């Protein structure tokens, strides 16, 4: 059945997870969409089919536990918002324990069929070689990590040479509450006070010589992940994996990212550390700290085991583990406004992995938000942002401004791709965590589990309220 709409179409460039979700959200709001996808005309080094929302790597959407896992929470919020990606994933799930894994072909076929069958969506198989022309007054770029070189060059020309990255160099991120401050201490090197700093901007983890040598041995022996053939990613100055630096000489690390100079152990000031691992605040909330200079190609299991050898990180919980990949993403915190619009080009939004989110559902969720925002703008409705207390809102807030931008490490950019995790959510109100009756000791893992359950419960309630409010605003417009 044909549906006639009086609205001009919104253009979406890229038919991956984010672009497909954005197109679906726009069409679901009654606005026509033209979805441009180059596969079918021009392939990529990683994709195998012409299907929309093809899963290039894993077939897992990770945990589906919405009671105490941040990924499960964003799954639930996307379902509430009518996500096509989640509906297709649910229909084509395969057994995977507590995770949501899918039959990749069935999933992609379902998304492709739904997009093609929607009367308000037109799919055009063509390569877009530049930024959208002026007559595309509203558009979304969702071209992902394998953005075509010509379009990437156009984005770079519009936003500036340093605004677009072609590789990510991800260092692990640790939850602040899991760091042992009886061993670690706050201090900037030489007590330097930088812009917005206090002279105590880093958390420092000391090592003696024996600990350092054991750590270097573990790094050299650790299992690593090789580059995929299509990545062709070279190592470059300023972003060597930590294990590669260790292989270049036993003293390399303690004269590089683990140098102890300018630091005094607050717990034992008369003893000079042989080496020091520094962690820097990563988000404005102060809940996440990244391991400075620790980008790595170690396998995830090896990372957790080896990095917990660091004094003070024995019980570390990781919000994100490290990696080094081919990727194309913009410096979103400086380029995008809170509605994902490019500040220099009103009407042009970015969505998905190109914004600096990491993961299938994260990419789709940013597409979901970009699509809803663009549809509201087309219809003349007020753009309603998801609350920061929701998974959608916390991820959006981090991408568009929650990350703390630093420039003290030449050759590196501080903004790196981020997955959804509880460290992005605002803290609970004081007094929210109450010890259960009859429990004598309530701390550590038990307290963390309750905290996450409360954050998840708050997120889902606030998301439901936001979606209800958004529907009301649309009805009034």
From Swiss-Prot:
Which parts of the sequence bind FAD? Answer: 14-19
Subcellular localization, as worded in the UniProt entry: Cytoplasm
Q: Which UniProt keywords apply?
A: Cytoplasm, FAD, Flavoprotein, Methyltransferase, NAD, NADP, Transferase, tRNA processing
The chemistry this enzyme catalyses reads: uridine(54) in tRNA + (6R)-5,10-methylene-5,6,7,8-tetrahydrofolate + NADH + H(+) = 5-methyluridine(54) in tRNA + (6S)-5,6,7,8-tetrahydrofolate + NAD(+); uridine(54) in tRNA + (6R)-5,10-methylene-5,6,7,8-tetrahydrofolate + NADPH + H(+) = 5-methyluridine(54) in tRNA + (6S)-5,6,7,8-tetrahydrofolate + NADP(+)
Gene Ontology MF, one = tRNA (uracil(54)-C5)-methyltransferase activity, 5,10-methylenetetrahydrofolate-dependent
Enzyme Commission number: 2.1.1.74
Which SUPFAM superfamilies is this protein grouped with?
FAD/NAD(P)-binding domain
For activity, the cofactor(s) needed are: FAD
Q: Which family does it belong to?
A: Belongs to the MnmG family. TrmFO subfamily.
Query: What name has this protein been given in UniProt?
Result: Methylenetetrahydrofolate--tRNA-(uracil-5-)-methyltransferase TrmFO
At the highest ranks, the source species' classification is: Bacteria, Pseudomonadati, Pseudomonadota, Alphaproteobacteria, Hyphomicrobiales
Tell me the gene name. trmFO
């Amino acid at each position: 059945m044909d549906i006639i709409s009086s609205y001009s179409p919104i253009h979406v460039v890229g038919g991956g997870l984010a672009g497909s979700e954005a197109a679906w959200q726009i069409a679901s709001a009654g606005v026509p969409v033209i979805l441009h996808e180059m596969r079918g005309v021009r392939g990529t080094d990683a994709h195998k089919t012409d299907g929309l929302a093809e899963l290039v790597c894993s077939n897992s959407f990770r945990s589906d536990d919405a009671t105490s896992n941040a990924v499960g929470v964003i799954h639930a919020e996307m379902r509430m918002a009518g996500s096509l990606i989640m509906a297709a994933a649910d229909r084509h799930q395969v057994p995977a324990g507590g995770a949501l894994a899918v039959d990749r072909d069935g999933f992609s076929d379902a998304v492709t069929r739904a997009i093609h069958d929607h009367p308000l969506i037109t799919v055009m198989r063509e390569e877009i070689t530049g930024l959208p022309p002026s007559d595309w007054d509203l558009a979304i770029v969702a071209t992902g990590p394998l953005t075509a070189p010509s379009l990437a060059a156009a984005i770079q020309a519009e936003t500036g040479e340093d605004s677009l990255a072609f590789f990510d160099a991800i260092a692990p991120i640790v939850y602040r509450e899991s760091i042992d401050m009886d061993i670690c201490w706050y201090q900037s090197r030489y007590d330097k006070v930088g812009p917005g700093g206090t002279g105590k901007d880093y958390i420092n983890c000391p090592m003696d010589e024996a600990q350092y040598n054991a750590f270097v041995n573990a790094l050299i022996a650790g299992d690593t992940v090789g580059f995929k053939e299509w990545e062709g990613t070279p190592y470059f100055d300023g972003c060597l994996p930590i294990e590669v630096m260790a292989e270049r000489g036993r003293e390399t690390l303690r004269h590089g990212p683990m140098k102890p100079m300018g630091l005094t152990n607050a717990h034992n000031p008369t003893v000079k550390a042989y080496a020091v691992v520094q962690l820097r605040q990563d988000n404005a909330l102060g809940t996440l700290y990244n391991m400075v200079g620790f980008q790595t190609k170690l396998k995830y299991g090896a990372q957790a085991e080896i990095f917990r050898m660091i004094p003070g990180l024995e019980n570390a919980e990781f919000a994100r583990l490290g990696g080094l990949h081919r990727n194309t993403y913009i410096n979103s915190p400086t380029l995008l406004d809170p509605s994902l619009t490019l500040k220099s080009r009103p009407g042009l939004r970015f969505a998905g992995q190109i914004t600096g989110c990491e993961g299938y559902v994260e990419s789709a969720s940013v597409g979901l938000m970009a699509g809803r925002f663009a549809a509201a703008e087309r219809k003349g409705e007020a753009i309603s942002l998801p609350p920061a207390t929701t998974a959608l809102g916390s991820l959006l807030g981090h991408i568009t401004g929650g990350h703390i931008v630093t420039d003290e490490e030449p050759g590196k950019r501080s903004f790196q791709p981020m997955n959804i995790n509880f460290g992005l959510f605002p803290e609970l109100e004081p007094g929210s965590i109450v010890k259960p009756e009859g429990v004598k000791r309530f701390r550590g893992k038990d307290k963390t589990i309750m905290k996450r359950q409360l954050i998840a419960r708050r997120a889902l309630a606030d998301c439901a309220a936001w979606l209800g409010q958004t529907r009301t605003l649309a009805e009034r417009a």
